[in-house]
Protein backbone atom coordinates (compact mmCIF):
# COMPACT_ATOMS: atom_id res chain seq x y z
CA UNK A 1 0.00 0.00 0.00
CA UNK A 2 1.63 3.24 -1.14
CA UNK A 3 1.52 6.47 0.80
CA UNK A 4 -1.36 7.97 -1.17
CA UNK A 5 -3.47 4.91 -0.37
CA UNK A 6 -2.60 5.16 3.32
CA UNK A 7 -3.54 8.83 3.34
CA UNK A 8 -6.79 8.01 1.58
CA UNK A 9 -7.77 5.51 4.28
CA UNK A 10 -6.79 8.04 6.95
CA UNK A 11 -9.02 10.65 5.32
CA UNK A 12 -11.86 8.17 4.87
CA UNK A 13 -11.96 7.57 8.63
CA UNK A 14 -11.68 11.36 9.25
CA UNK A 15 -8.77 10.81 11.61
CA UNK A 16 -7.38 13.99 10.08
CA UNK A 17 -10.49 15.87 11.27
CA UNK A 18 -11.19 15.01 14.92
CA UNK A 19 -14.14 17.40 15.36
CA UNK A 20 -16.68 14.60 14.86
CA UNK A 21 -14.98 12.37 17.42
CA UNK A 22 -14.91 15.23 19.91
CA UNK A 23 -18.60 16.01 19.42
CA UNK A 24 -19.34 12.35 20.09
CA UNK A 25 -16.87 12.10 22.96
CA UNK A 26 -18.09 15.06 25.05
CA UNK A 27 -21.62 13.73 25.77
CA UNK A 28 -20.15 10.28 26.41
CA UNK A 29 -17.93 11.81 29.07
CA UNK A 30 -20.85 13.80 30.50
CA UNK A 31 -22.73 10.53 30.97
CA UNK A 32 -19.80 8.59 32.43
CA UNK A 33 -19.00 11.22 35.06
CA UNK A 34 -22.66 11.72 36.01
CA UNK A 35 -23.32 7.98 36.17
CA UNK A 36 -20.29 7.51 38.43
CA UNK A 37 -21.05 10.69 40.40
CA UNK A 38 -17.33 11.31 40.12
CA UNK A 39 -14.43 9.69 38.31
CA UNK A 40 -15.66 6.70 36.28
CA UNK A 41 -14.03 3.27 36.32
CA UNK A 42 -10.81 3.45 34.30
CA UNK A 43 -11.58 0.35 32.27
CA UNK A 44 -14.99 1.70 31.32
CA UNK A 45 -13.51 5.11 30.48
CA UNK A 46 -10.85 3.64 28.19
CA UNK A 47 -13.35 1.36 26.44
CA UNK A 48 -15.72 4.24 25.70
CA UNK A 49 -13.02 6.63 24.51
CA UNK A 50 -11.67 4.01 22.10
CA UNK A 51 -15.22 3.05 21.13
CA UNK A 52 -16.00 6.65 20.24
CA UNK A 53 -12.97 6.81 17.94
CA UNK A 54 -13.75 3.48 16.24
CA UNK A 55 -17.49 4.06 15.80
CA UNK A 56 -17.11 7.64 14.63
CA UNK A 57 -14.62 6.44 12.02
CA UNK A 58 -16.96 3.60 11.05
CA UNK A 59 -19.79 6.11 10.69
CA UNK A 60 -17.67 8.27 8.39
CA UNK A 61 -16.76 5.29 6.23
CA UNK A 62 -20.36 4.10 5.78
CA UNK A 63 -21.45 7.72 5.21
CA UNK A 64 -18.96 8.13 2.38
CA UNK A 65 -19.98 4.76 0.95
CA UNK A 66 -23.63 5.85 0.91
CA UNK A 67 -22.70 9.21 -0.66
CA UNK A 68 -20.10 7.90 -3.11
CA UNK A 69 -22.23 8.66 -6.19
CA UNK A 70 -23.17 12.20 -5.15
CA UNK A 71 -20.05 13.45 -3.35
CA UNK A 72 -18.37 14.17 -6.67
CA UNK A 73 -21.03 16.79 -7.40
CA UNK A 74 -20.54 18.68 -4.13
CA UNK A 75 -17.74 21.22 -3.93
CA UNK A 76 -16.72 20.31 -0.37
CA UNK A 77 -16.66 16.53 -0.91
CA UNK A 78 -15.55 16.08 -4.53
CA UNK A 79 -12.02 15.04 -3.56
CA UNK A 80 -12.95 12.44 -0.95
CA UNK A 81 -11.28 9.01 -1.38
CA UNK A 82 -14.33 7.16 -2.76
CA UNK A 83 -15.55 9.63 -5.44
CA UNK A 84 -11.93 10.29 -6.47
CA UNK A 85 -11.34 6.56 -6.97
CA UNK A 86 -8.46 6.21 -4.50
CA UNK A 87 -10.47 3.65 -2.49
CA UNK A 88 -12.98 1.14 -3.86
CA UNK A 89 -16.41 0.44 -2.41
CA UNK A 90 -15.28 -3.06 -1.42
CA UNK A 91 -12.29 -1.65 0.47
CA UNK A 92 -14.51 0.89 2.24
CA UNK A 93 -17.00 -1.77 3.35
CA UNK A 94 -14.16 -3.99 4.56
CA UNK A 95 -12.75 -1.13 6.63
CA UNK A 96 -16.22 -0.41 8.04
CA UNK A 97 -16.58 -4.05 9.10
CA UNK A 98 -13.17 -4.04 10.80
CA UNK A 99 -13.99 -0.86 12.75
CA UNK A 100 -17.38 -2.20 13.87
CA UNK A 101 -15.83 -5.51 14.96
CA UNK A 102 -13.15 -3.65 16.95
CA UNK A 103 -15.87 -1.59 18.63
CA UNK A 104 -17.92 -4.67 19.46
CA UNK A 105 -14.89 -6.48 20.90
CA UNK A 106 -14.46 -3.55 23.27
CA UNK A 107 -18.13 -3.68 24.25
CA UNK A 108 -17.84 -7.40 25.01
CA UNK A 109 -15.72 -6.48 28.03
CA UNK A 110 -18.72 -4.61 29.48
CA UNK A 111 -21.82 -5.96 31.25
CA UNK A 112 -24.78 -7.63 29.53
CA UNK A 113 -26.99 -4.52 29.47
CA UNK A 114 -24.30 -2.49 27.70
CA UNK A 115 -23.76 -5.25 25.14
CA UNK A 116 -27.50 -5.41 24.42
CA UNK A 117 -27.72 -1.63 23.96
CA UNK A 118 -24.75 -1.60 21.59
CA UNK A 119 -26.74 -3.35 18.87
CA UNK A 120 -29.09 -0.38 18.58
CA UNK A 121 -26.10 1.93 18.29
CA UNK A 122 -24.74 -0.02 15.33
CA UNK A 123 -28.12 0.08 13.57
CA UNK A 124 -28.35 3.86 14.05
CA UNK A 125 -24.81 4.36 12.73
CA UNK A 126 -25.63 2.39 9.58
CA UNK A 127 -29.06 3.97 9.06
CA UNK A 128 -28.09 7.64 9.28
CA UNK A 129 -26.25 8.05 5.94
CA UNK A 130 -29.16 6.56 4.00
CA UNK A 131 -31.77 8.79 5.66
CA UNK A 132 -30.64 11.76 3.56
CA UNK A 133 -32.44 10.20 0.59
CA UNK A 134 -35.78 9.49 2.25
CA UNK A 135 -36.40 12.24 4.81
CA UNK A 136 -35.64 15.89 5.47
CA UNK A 137 -34.82 14.90 9.06
CA UNK A 138 -31.55 12.94 8.80
CA UNK A 139 -30.19 15.21 11.54
CA UNK A 140 -32.80 13.71 13.86
CA UNK A 141 -31.40 10.24 13.19
CA UNK A 142 -27.87 11.56 13.72
CA UNK A 143 -29.06 13.01 17.02
CA UNK A 144 -30.18 9.55 18.11
CA UNK A 145 -26.94 7.96 16.89
CA UNK A 146 -24.68 10.53 18.56
CA UNK A 147 -26.66 10.24 21.80
CA UNK A 148 -26.82 6.47 22.07
CA UNK A 149 -23.50 6.30 23.91
CA UNK A 150 -25.24 8.04 26.83
CA UNK A 151 -27.53 5.16 27.91
CA UNK A 152 -24.68 2.78 27.13
CA UNK A 153 -22.35 4.75 29.41
CA UNK A 154 -24.87 4.65 32.26
CA UNK A 155 -25.38 0.94 31.70
CA UNK A 156 -21.64 0.27 31.76
CA UNK A 157 -20.97 2.37 34.83
CA UNK A 158 -24.04 1.57 36.95
CA UNK A 159 -25.76 -1.39 35.22
CA UNK A 160 -28.94 0.67 34.81
CA UNK A 161 -30.31 3.47 32.64
CA UNK A 162 -32.12 5.89 35.00
CA UNK A 163 -34.42 8.75 33.91
CA UNK A 164 -31.56 11.26 34.11
CA UNK A 165 -29.78 9.31 31.36
CA UNK A 166 -32.74 9.75 29.02
CA UNK A 167 -32.96 13.45 29.87
CA UNK A 168 -29.28 13.78 28.95
CA UNK A 169 -30.03 11.75 25.80
CA UNK A 170 -32.70 14.27 24.75
CA UNK A 171 -30.41 17.22 25.54
CA UNK A 172 -27.65 15.85 23.37
CA UNK A 173 -30.00 14.87 20.54
CA UNK A 174 -31.36 18.44 20.38
CA UNK A 175 -27.84 19.87 20.45
CA UNK A 176 -26.78 17.49 17.67
CA UNK A 177 -29.71 18.53 15.48
CA UNK A 178 -28.76 22.18 16.02
CA UNK A 179 -25.09 21.87 15.12
CA UNK A 180 -25.61 19.43 12.27
CA UNK A 181 -28.15 21.83 10.77
CA UNK A 182 -25.39 24.45 10.83
CA UNK A 183 -23.19 21.91 9.06
CA UNK A 184 -25.92 21.18 6.51
CA UNK A 185 -26.25 24.91 5.78
CA UNK A 186 -22.74 24.74 4.30
CA UNK A 187 -23.85 22.30 1.57
CA UNK A 188 -27.46 23.42 1.20
CA UNK A 189 -27.21 24.80 -2.35
CA UNK A 190 -25.39 21.70 -3.61
CA UNK A 191 -27.75 19.36 -1.76
CA UNK A 192 -30.82 20.94 -3.37
CA UNK A 193 -29.34 20.35 -6.82
CA UNK A 194 -28.52 16.68 -6.26
CA UNK A 195 -31.59 15.73 -4.23
CA UNK A 196 -30.01 15.27 -0.80
CA UNK A 197 -32.38 16.16 2.05
CA UNK A 198 -31.55 17.93 5.32
CA UNK A 199 -33.07 20.03 8.08
CA UNK A 200 -31.27 23.04 6.60
CA UNK A 201 -33.43 22.65 3.49
CA UNK A 202 -36.57 21.79 5.46
CA UNK A 203 -36.26 24.78 7.80
CA UNK A 204 -35.53 27.17 4.93
CA UNK A 205 -35.61 30.83 5.98
CA UNK A 206 -36.52 29.76 9.52
CA UNK A 207 -33.23 27.87 9.93
CA UNK A 208 -31.58 30.38 12.28
CA UNK A 209 -34.71 30.71 14.41
CA UNK A 210 -35.17 26.95 14.78
CA UNK A 211 -31.49 26.46 15.59
CA UNK A 212 -31.89 29.16 18.25
CA UNK A 213 -34.94 27.43 19.71
CA UNK A 214 -33.07 24.12 19.81
CA UNK A 215 -30.17 25.81 21.59
CA UNK A 216 -32.52 27.42 24.12
CA UNK A 217 -34.12 24.03 24.74
CA UNK A 218 -30.69 22.51 25.37
CA UNK A 219 -29.84 25.21 27.90
CA UNK A 220 -33.22 24.94 29.65
CA UNK A 221 -32.99 21.15 29.92
CA UNK A 222 -29.41 21.37 31.18
CA UNK A 223 -30.69 23.60 33.98
CA UNK A 224 -33.43 21.04 34.73
CA UNK A 225 -30.80 18.29 34.80
CA UNK A 226 -28.62 20.28 37.17
CA UNK A 227 -31.56 20.91 39.47
CA UNK A 228 -32.61 17.25 39.52
CA UNK A 229 -29.07 16.08 40.33
CA UNK A 230 -28.36 18.95 42.75
CA UNK A 231 -25.20 19.92 40.87
CA UNK A 232 -23.11 22.75 42.30
CA UNK A 233 -22.90 26.37 41.22
CA UNK A 234 -19.86 25.63 39.05
CA UNK A 235 -22.14 23.68 36.74
CA UNK A 236 -24.40 26.67 36.13
CA UNK A 237 -21.45 28.93 35.33
CA UNK A 238 -20.53 26.40 32.65
CA UNK A 239 -24.05 26.52 31.24
CA UNK A 240 -23.88 30.32 31.15
CA UNK A 241 -20.61 30.14 29.22
CA UNK A 242 -22.15 27.64 26.79
CA UNK A 243 -25.02 30.08 26.25
CA UNK A 244 -22.45 32.70 25.28
CA UNK A 245 -21.06 30.40 22.61
CA UNK A 246 -24.57 29.77 21.27
CA UNK A 247 -25.07 33.54 20.94
CA UNK A 248 -21.76 33.75 19.07
CA UNK A 249 -22.89 30.97 16.72
CA UNK A 250 -26.09 32.85 15.96
CA UNK A 251 -23.99 35.85 15.05
CA UNK A 252 -21.82 33.71 12.77
CA UNK A 253 -24.72 32.21 10.81
CA UNK A 254 -26.66 35.45 10.45
CA UNK A 255 -25.64 35.84 6.78
CA UNK A 256 -25.71 32.09 6.00
CA UNK A 257 -22.25 32.21 4.38
CA UNK A 258 -20.67 28.77 3.94
CA UNK A 259 -17.46 29.47 5.84
CA UNK A 260 -19.28 31.21 8.70
CA UNK A 261 -21.76 28.35 9.08
CA UNK A 262 -18.90 25.85 9.15
CA UNK A 263 -17.13 27.96 11.76
CA UNK A 264 -20.31 27.94 13.87
CA UNK A 265 -20.46 24.16 13.59
CA UNK A 266 -16.84 23.82 14.74
CA UNK A 267 -17.51 26.16 17.66
CA UNK A 268 -19.72 23.50 19.22
CA UNK A 269 -16.60 21.66 20.31
CA UNK A 270 -16.13 24.40 22.91
CA UNK A 271 -19.74 24.01 24.04
CA UNK A 272 -19.30 20.28 24.62
CA UNK A 273 -16.00 20.83 26.39
CA UNK A 274 -17.43 23.53 28.64
CA UNK A 275 -20.35 21.36 29.68
CA UNK A 276 -17.94 18.52 30.44
CA UNK A 277 -15.80 20.80 32.60
CA UNK A 278 -18.94 22.04 34.37
CA UNK A 279 -20.19 18.51 35.05
CA UNK A 280 -16.84 17.03 36.07
CA UNK A 281 -16.02 19.96 38.34
CA UNK A 282 -19.42 19.69 39.99
CA UNK A 283 -19.14 15.96 40.74
CA UNK A 284 -15.43 15.89 41.59
CA UNK A 285 -15.03 19.00 43.74
UniProtKB/Swiss-Prot annotation:
InterPro entries: HB_polyprenyltransferase-like (IPR006370), Prenyltransferase (IPR039653), UbiA_prenyltransferase (IPR000537), UbiA_sf (IPR044878)
Domain of life, per lineage: Bacteria
Chain segments annotated as transmembrane: 19-39, 42-62, 82-102, 104-124, 136-156, 166-186, 210-230, 233-253, 265-285
Reaction catalyzed: all-trans-octaprenyl diphosphate + 4-hydroxybenzoate = 4-hydroxy-3-(all-trans-octaprenyl)benzoate + diphosphate
Gene Ontology MF: a single term: 4-hydroxybenzoate polyprenyltransferase activity
Gene Ontology biological process: ubiquinone biosynthetic process
Enzyme class: transferase
Protein name: 4-hydroxybenzoate octaprenyltransferase
Amino acid sequence: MNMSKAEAFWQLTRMNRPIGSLLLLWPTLWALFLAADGLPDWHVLIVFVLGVVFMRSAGCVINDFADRKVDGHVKRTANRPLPSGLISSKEALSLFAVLVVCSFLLVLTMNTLTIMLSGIGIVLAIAYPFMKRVTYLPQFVLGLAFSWAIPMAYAAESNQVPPEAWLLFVINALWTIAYDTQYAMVDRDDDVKIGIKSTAILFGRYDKTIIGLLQLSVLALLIVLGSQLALSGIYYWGILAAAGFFVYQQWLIKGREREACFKAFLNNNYVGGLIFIAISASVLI
